[in-house]
Amino acid sequence: MKLTRRHFIKINSVAAAGIGLGVTPVFASAVAPVFESQRPKLADRKFTSKAVEAIIKKVKADIKDPEVAWLFENCYPNTLDTTVNYSEKDGKPDTFVITGDINAMWMRDSSAQVWPYLPLIKNDPGLKKLIQGVLSRQAKCVIIDPYANAFNEGPTGSEWDSDRTTMKPELHERKWEIDSLCYPVRLAYNYWKISGDSNFFDDNWQKAGKIILATFKEQQRKDGKGPYFFQRKTETQSDTAPNRGYGNPVKPVGLICSIFRPSDDATIYPFLIPSNYFAVASLNQMAEMYSAIGHDNATADACKALAAEVQAALEQYAVGHHPQFGKVIPFEVDGYGNQLFMDDSNVPSLLALPYLDSVKVDDPLYQSTRKFVLSDSNPYYFKGTAAEGIGGPHVGIGYIWPMAIIMRGITSTDKAEIVQCIKWLKATHAGTGFMHESFNKDDAKDFTRKWFAWANTLFGELILKVHEHYPDILQQTF
């Protein structure tokens, strides 16, 4: 069976849920629930960080609700416990990060999975080296193929070798998604800002950065369709691209095409707006690094110029009028005037724009857009007896993604809304102690992907943010 992010197994019993992680879920006793750690045994963990362990101990002690404390203990270290493969090659750190139940490294997921550990690297040299290894591996991946979204650990080939695109043995999958090039920039930039260490910005990373810049320009499609195309023999419409693999037509207006979304689903209109916002932030971050670290003002200026061009195009073409919510940001556009009003659970999303430093959380346009995407006017916003939240076409109608509930909490400044998000997350882990890819809006035991490290670590990030900014919230039972 081919294991991709589209592949999922619906688990309808809590007992089965822990099998893939080597753990046994704990059920409530007749007296009181007992929450035993669902982490692997110490000897079986992929990587152990003293700084992470100290944070777990500290934050757990400040969480009144024992089940939420248990979820935090299980989820926050899940990436380190189960998905990282650290080594040294040619005397340099190298870290391969799998998604969880898929044995491949997504550029997006690998960046997001280690992101919440960045604030700790100044106090943990081992953790710092591990993230250096991620940066190094990602630069190599970009050089191999900037259009690929997921990579193998080595040149082993893939079950997707038959896709009609330019596959290479190092690639797991070759779906062009703008954010696959933005996430590594975000990780590198913030690693530099937090640690003060610029050694990662070597010849290899600078080469990768220039490839990112060139790829973004190429996918503005000012000079034709460009070299990328993708077709797959499939029964799932969103798993392949129309028009012989080049996607639906666009008018070159300065925006960047993304043939696939961060969900790995094909775009309808290739100017994917959340990802274009993300690209602007990434280009400005690259400009700063090329200038301050590399003293390469020519590349820095080129990055700034492209960022300004995309930003101007967003302001002109990525504002729409919704009959109920007024002026909002559309999810996708084509430059001809067509706009798609929706949001998806995967990040980048419209909901997540402040999280990615693309807009201010109090920006009026973002706030009106937020109200839209968190309403039933968004075709992928689902309300059920288990919870309510954003899903998407990747899994299907009626399935809410914990990631979207988490992101709603992270981007909220409303304590009541944050409390509600934590309540939903507590109520929908189906007794497993972990976040999942998605769950049925009316039955949380009907879920997909029992081992999805990004969602787990992101839950940890939510709790850390609440602990820092709204500690009183954690002094209640949810």
Residue ranges and their predicted role:
Residues 71, 125-141, 197-217, 286-317, ...:
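Extended, well-ordered alpha-helical scaffold segments
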Residues 51-64, 112-125, 183-198, 277-296, ...:
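Well-ordered alpha-helical scaffold segments within catalytic/enzyme domains
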Residues 107, 142, 147, 154, ...:
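Extended ligand-binding clefts on enzyme/binding-domain cores
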Residues 80-93, 156-164, 249-261, 431-437:
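Active-site-adjacent bridging/hinge elements
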Residues 7-29:
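N-terminal export signals
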Residues 163-169, 174-177, 340-360, 398-478:
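C-terminal capping/lid segments that line or modulate ligand- or cofactor-binding pockets
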Residues 11-14, 30-108:
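Low-complexity, Ser/Thr/Pro/Gly-enriched N-terminal "stalk/linker" regions
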